[in-house]
């Protein structure tokens, strides 16, 4: 988690009479023991199944999703309130204090663009939720992580808004989405960003530029919009770069050639046959 997010979560919990504890996975066994003394566990990144299993064995209740955007935070506060049997009045007062601030932060920096989201961090779904609440169209969300019951709420929320959510997404899945959707911005891993740039589409590295900022609460709503809008504004520069480098080749024909590129069609054909043979052999083994 981004270092500021536990503080942002703590600010949401404070009016409920609660506090944020240790962040897990942790570095020291002392922190793990302190974490096991908690009243409940927020599975903010719901893919740490081994860590969650330890808390389940210790009899601790697990809360899925995360306090992102207005709807996500509203639902999360309800879940926390139910877990700790907090009075409805206190829950209502907490919402009145927190939710308008998040809404204002989202309204101040509207994102009226189409964005694809992919990565391997585990926070892709909650980032997409925040972007949609900020006004963005997000047709595709891909995560390399598996589907777990702690991400079900986020998945259902996204799918109800027409988002295609892909768990265990491959690089091919992510690149295919970028090509077919032709977004105003592609957020993804290094090869996804490289492919988007080749296509002249503004792009952001998920790990460096999305995970490296707060996502939760009021701070998260504002900080995400800032970097997104700045990247989208580079669209015309990307088009200029694409036209400037047009005709220099790509893949194994990239670069400046004095003559024709040294293509090796016979080598490609030979490799294709070898790959096909391996596929046939693998299929035969499955049948056995």
Role assignments for model-derived ranges:
Residues 1-288:
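An N-terminal assembly and electron-transfer interface module characteristic of large anaerobic redox
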């Amino acid at each position: 988690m981004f270092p500021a997010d536990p503080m942002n979560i703590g600010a949401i919990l404070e009016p409920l009479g609660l506090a944020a504890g240790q962040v897990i996975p942790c570095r020291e066994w002392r922190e793990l023991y302190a974490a096991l003394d908690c009243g409940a566990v927020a599975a903010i990144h719901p893919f740490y199944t081994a860590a969650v299993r330890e808390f389940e064995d210790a009899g601790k209740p697990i809360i899925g999703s995360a306090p992102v955007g207005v709807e996500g935070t509203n639902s999360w506060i309800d879940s926390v309130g139910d877990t700790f049997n907090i009075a409805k009045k206190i829950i209502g007062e907490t919402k009145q204090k927190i939710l308008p601030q998040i809404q204002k932060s989202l309204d101040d920096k509207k994102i009226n663009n189409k964005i694809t989201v992919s990565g391997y961090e585990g926070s892709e779904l909650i980032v997409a939720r925040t972007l949609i609440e900020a006004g963005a169209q997000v047709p595709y969300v891909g995560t390399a992580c598996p589907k777990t019951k702690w991400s079900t709420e986020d998945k259902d929320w996204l799918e109800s808004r027409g988002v295609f959510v892909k768990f265990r997404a491959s690089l091919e899945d992510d690149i295919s989405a970028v090509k077919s959707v032709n977004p105003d911005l592609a957020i993804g891993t290094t090869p996804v960003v490289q492919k988007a740039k080749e296509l002249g589409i503004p792009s952001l590295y998920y790990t460096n530029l999305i995970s490296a900022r707060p996502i939760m609460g009021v701070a998260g709503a504002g900080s995400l919009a800032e970097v997104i809008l700045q990247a989208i504004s580079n669209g015309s520069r990307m088009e200029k770069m694409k036209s400037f480098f047009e005709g220099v080749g790509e893949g194994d024909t990239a670069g400046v050639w004095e003559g024709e590129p040294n293509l090796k069609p016979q080598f490609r054909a030979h490799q294709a046959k070898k790959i096909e043979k391996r596929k046939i052999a693998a299929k035969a083994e499955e049948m056995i």
